[in-house]
UniProtKB/Swiss-Prot annotation:
Keywords: Cell membrane, Chemotaxis, Disulfide bond, G-protein coupled receptor, Glycoprotein, Membrane, Receptor, Transducer, Transmembrane, Transmembrane helix. Receptor for platelet activating factor, a chemotactic phospholipid mediator that possesses potent inflammatory, smooth-muscle contractile and hypotensive activity. Seems to mediate its action via a G protein that activates a phosphatidylinositol-calcium second messenger system. Coiled coil: none annotated. Residues 39-54, 114-133, 206-233, 297-342 are cytoplasmic. Residues 1-16, 75-91, 156-184, 255-276 are extracellular. Its main location: membrane. This is Platelet-activating factor receptor. InterPro entries: Cit_transptr-like_dom, GPCR_Rhodpsn, GPCR_Rhodpsn_7TM, PAF_rcpt.
Amino acid sequence: MEPNNSFRVDSEFRYTLFPIFYSIVFVLGVIANSYVLWVFARLYPSKKFNEIKIFMVNLTMADLLFLVTLPLWIVYYYNQGDWILPKFLCNLAGCFFFINTYCSVAFLAVITYNRFQAVTRPIKTAQATTRKRGFLLSLIIWVSIVGAASYFFVLDSTNSEPKKTGSGNITRCFEHYEKGSIPVLIIHIFLVFSFFLVFLIILFCNLVIIRTLLTQQVQMQRNAEVKRRALWMVCTVLAVFVICFVPHHLVQLPWTLAELGFQDTDFHQGINDAHQVTLCLLSTNCVLDPIIYCFLTKKFRKHLTEKLYSMRESRKCSRATSETGTEVVVQLKDAPIKSLKY
């Protein structure tokens, strides 16, 4: 394939979409993930962390790494795609974006496999000492992905482009590919195919879990509740993948080909527009991941339910107090003066 020399396309709607969308994700994500860490620190001593809880904490940390860089991207898109911050922050933002994306995929994969083992081999899983394995797998995931992400620290991440007005230049952040670069294409092919391999494994494990749970005989109400939660957990994990990760990786390879100049201009514009939307969807995993924890741990779910109930009762009390106070004021106002004794 020979690259063409099409002009640089842009999707200008992103300069409105990203600041608004990322601001919402930032607020909700920081609140949700900080609360998750607080609950885990309060409810679970470190010695009682089993494999699944270790994976959950690591997934939360990966989400927070991305969330702390969202203000940088908000400033970038608010300034019409002009990186006005120090260059190293562009490298840092790109690095954390990569870490969050693939650490999230990896930890969701090992969480799914853990649940797969618990359903298909419950006795063996219950007897296994999995705490060390949890730490070891987490270490392998972090070292592998952070090692791969270190590429973004040495990469020349910014480039200058003339403004559309014709006066001066703007600085882009991770928006430049050398036309016809085969190494860049190979890297993206590897990432996309690796993702879909992991996704197929996760899909297989979840389908086996669903089938096993649906074919089991439920003899007790408590077991029925456990089964229902397990099914919801499976559906939530699949939903996170389908909503957040699959659209981005479906678009990523065609978009890369267009960026490298192997597609015509009309296709490039359309796929670039789609790519911006999938980037928004990708960021929502930071908000959706904490939902999975509600179905994975009994203590977490109980603590959250108690807090929500307490807040609801507090509002009822406040409203009742307010209404009682109003009634007293009305009664005093209507009472004869002589009946008021001091």
